[in-house]
Amino acid sequence: MWYSIYCEDKKNSLDLRMKTRESHLEKLKLLLDQGRILIAGPCPAIDNEDPGEHGFTGSLIVAKFPSIQEAKEWAKNDPYYIAGVFESVTVKPFKKVFP
């Protein structure tokens, strides 16, 4: 089943986010290579794809997992979570309708 993983960043976490970015992307690439990512990316803090020093407010990942528990475990093992970038993480079942 698909699960949405919404991660809210801690304030002023941009430097930590950027230091941890490569390992975070490597973890996502494993899911991508397995065909398990529907969409993934950060949420800019301003209305611009490149927010610069304004940074990001969080991230959204919609990916396929065998269960919600496995989705939560995956999120807890994300390098951003481990490094302390995220204030909170919410995992919910997701039903794809379009496209």
Range-by-range predicted roles:
Residues 1-99:
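Conserved, structured core segments of small domains
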